[in-house]
Amino acid sequence: MDLDQIVADAQQSFEQAADITTLENEKARFLGKSGALTELLKGLGKLDPEARKTEGARINVAKQQVEAALTARRQALADALLNQRLTAEAIDVTLPGRGAGAGSLHPVMRTWERVEQIFGSIGFDVADGPEIETDWYNFTSLNSPENHPARSMQDTFYVEGKDADGRQLLLRTHTSPMQVRYARMNRPPIKVIAPGRTYRVDSDATHSPMFNQVEGLWIDENISFADLKGVYTDFLKKFFERDDILVRFRPSYFPFTEPSAEIDMMFEQGKNAGKWLEISGSGQVHPTVIRNMGLDPERYIGFAFGSGLERLTMLRYGVQDLRLFFENDLRFLRQFA
């Protein structure tokens, strides 16, 4: 076969190859083990030395031309593939940005901050304290000594470790221990709320093993039950932002207050109109508790109350199931953004 024709055929075949696979197949026709140029090189041994030298030089020139055409086509296919990819992945920098999603407060945290703001506006401090408590602060200081029947009212999470008296540490079952700690470090008048996480062995649509609570304490020389009623009623009206709220105090029992009362509220309008809704426990601080705070119960008196932050949130927003606050379902949480 004429060398010029072989080179021309190779160049045409390479140029018509639409992809790398086809190009490699065409390469084998001319440069493979049985390719046209390879066969010519094999036949050089049959020629005399002078003719072998001349013909070998011509074949090598043709081979170089074929390899150059092959390299050029490979590069052209690679460039085309790159351009195709760049086009597919192109970014229009003139398009508006997507922006980062805006976060928002959890509904219970909204309630937490709202409670702090309302009580802060009338002079209450905010106390903080450990969630892992000692037996004395969680029970004994609050008039629930060992074997007191009131302890059976709460199923408690006990944890590894013991306090200085050798008693098992526990997860606090209410935030009252923070009030005792605060009172032992401050002098009357004492006005403080203690919001925080608490733990009890309980879980259903209206109870959770971990929940948030806020407790309030006011101790001074001339505090009465009327002050408790006025402060808490005013809080409810500010929290729910409405004046059509009726409040009643039902006699009850708590070991740390005497007398004690459950606080119920009722809206005069809206879907809950006419329904008494339990909202808080309260009472005048028991003399034993005042004594455990390092104060003289003959001189000082006070009131205390405790409310669940989830309970307040459920009533404010009309949420029926407490567990929704802990499931992290964005469809639910976005309603409060």
UniProtKB/Swiss-Prot annotation:
Classification via Pfam families: Phe_tRNA-synt_N, tRNA-synt_2d
Annotated family: Belongs to the class-II aminoacyl-tRNA synthetase family. Phe-tRNA synthetase alpha subunit type 1 subfamily.
Predominant localisation class: cytoplasm
Co-factor: note: Binds 2 magnesium ions per tetramer.
Annotated protein name in UniProt: Phenylalanine--tRNA ligase alpha subunit
Keyword presence, Cytoplasm: yes
Cofactor needs: Mg(2+)
Gene that specifies this protein: pheS
Assembly information from the UniProt record: Tetramer of two alpha and two beta subunits.
Annotated source species: Burkholderia cenocepacia (strain ATCC BAA-245 / DSM 16553 / LMG 16656 / NCTC 13227 / J2315 / CF5610) (Burkholderia cepacia (strain J2315))
Any single GO CC term annotated in Swiss-Prot or TrEMBL for this entry: cytoplasm
